[in-house]
């Protein structure tokens, strides 16, 4: 859900950025100085504190940010915001992105336009609620791994480039058996990421839906399918596989799953509260990021 919100200002601002990304330290430093000039309390996440001079500022571990801040500003690209979402969502801390990456579907504000933040801090912004997925890997009765994903839960080949055979169940109903290089289970947020390159549909972020996108399927009739986001997806790895595939959440963690194991995916119970400037427009973002503004040349 996207709504324009006018509410009391944000006064305690936590800053986060990814080390090793060009321009991030400089933007963090400029942002810190700008926030101080606006008489806001600035809190540095531990890694951000290593990148700039924050000797006079409070430094807080990532998992404790909500105790000290009412807004998290992330400097980086979409990958940086994905990482921040994994930290902010369980704490229900709103997130605003400053783009230092390439595409920037999720990070709205350019680093040379930090003054846009002033209106947001004064309570004038758009708040968008985006759901996440929760993935669970089980082998027998044992839970091997569990994690959340803003973009996608992905079944990938193992170390050998071989096809994977697996069964798909939705709400305990058998859907199909597939042989493919893998499967992407994507949220609307992730539909413009890895799933898009795999031929998946673009899902508007306000849709309560997720898409299952097969990767290089063995049969031409195998196509992406869009399902209700309230569904539970079960992927059963065929015992006939002679390799153990991997399961990844947002590309951040990779867990091996043995043949016969199951991957369960469902909507996570906490959403991401993503903050945008009041002039944010989703279709405008698509036009800019996907070069839809370019008109076809006339013959």
Swiss-Prot record:
Protein name as catalogued: NAD kinase
Taxonomic superkingdom: Bacteria
Keywords recorded for this protein, A-Z: ATP-binding, Cytoplasm, Kinase, NAD, NADP, Nucleotide-binding, Transferase
Reported cofactor(s): a divalent metal cation
Family annotation (Gene3D superfamilies): Probable inorganic polyphosphate/atp-NAD kinase, domain 1, Probable inorganic polyphosphate/atp-NAD kinase, domain 2
InterPro entries listed in its UniProt record: ATP-NAD_kinase_N, ATP-NAD_kinase_PpnK-typ_C, NAD/diacylglycerol_kinase_sf, NADK
Database matches in Pfam families: NAD_kinase, NAD_kinase_C
HAMAP family linked to this entry: NAD_kinase (MF_00361)
Cellular component terms per the entry's GO annotation: cytoplasm
Active-site positions on this chain: 78
Catalytic activity: NAD(+) + ATP = ADP + NADP(+) + H(+)
Molecular-function GO terms, alphabetical: ATP binding; metal ion binding; NAD binding; NAD+ kinase activity
Protein family according to the UniProt entry: Belongs to the NAD kinase family.
Primary localization class, coarse: cytoplasm
Coiled coil residues, start to end: none
Ligand binding (NAD(+)): 78-79, 151-152, 162, 179, 181, 192-197, 252
Compartment(s): Cytoplasm
Function: Involved in the regulation of the intracellular balance of NAD and NADP, and is a key enzyme in the biosynthesis of NADP. Catalyzes specifically the phosphorylation on 2'-hydroxyl of the adenosine moiety of NAD to yield NADP.
E.C. number: 2.7.1.23
GO biological process, one term: NADP biosynthetic process
Gene encoding the protein: nadK
């Amino acid at each position: 859900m996207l709504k324009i919100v006018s509410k009391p200002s944000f006064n305690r601002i936590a800053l986060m950025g990814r080390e090793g990304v060009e321009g991030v330290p400089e933007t963090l430093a400029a942002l810190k100085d700008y926030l101080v000039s606006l008489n806001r309390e600035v809190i540095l996440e531990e890694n951000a504190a290593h990148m700039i001079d924050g000797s006079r500022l409070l430094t807080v571990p990532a998992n404790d940010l909500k105790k000290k801040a009412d807004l998290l500003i992330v400097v980086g690209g979409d990958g940086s915001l994905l990482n921040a979402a994994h930290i902010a969502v369980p704490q229900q801390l709103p997130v605003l992105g400053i783009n230092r990456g390439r595409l920037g579907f999720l990070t709205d504000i350019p680093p040379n336009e930090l003054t846009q933040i002033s209106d947001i801090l004064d309570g004038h912004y758009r708040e968008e609620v985006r759901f996440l997925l929760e993935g669970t890997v089980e082998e027998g009765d044992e839970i091997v791994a569990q994690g959340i994903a803003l973009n996608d839960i992905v079944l990938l080949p193992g170390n050998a480039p071989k096809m994977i055979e697996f069964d798909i169940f939705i709400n305990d109903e058998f859907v199909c058996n597939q042989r493919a290089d893998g499967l992407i289970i994507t949220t609307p947020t992730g539909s413009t990421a890895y799933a898009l390159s795999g031929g998946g549909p673009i899902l508007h972020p306000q849709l309560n839906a997720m898409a299952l996108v097969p990767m290089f399927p063995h049969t031409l009739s195998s196509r992406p399918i869009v399902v209700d986001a309230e569904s539970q997806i079960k992927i059963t790895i065929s015992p006939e596989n002679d390799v153990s595939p991997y399961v990844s959440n947002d590309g951040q963690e990779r867990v091996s799953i043995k043949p016969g194991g199951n991957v369960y995916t469902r909507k996570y119970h906490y959403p991401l509260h993503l903050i945008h400037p009041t002039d944010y427009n989703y279709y405008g973002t698509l036009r800019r990021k996907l070069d839809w503004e370019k008109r076809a040349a006339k013959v």
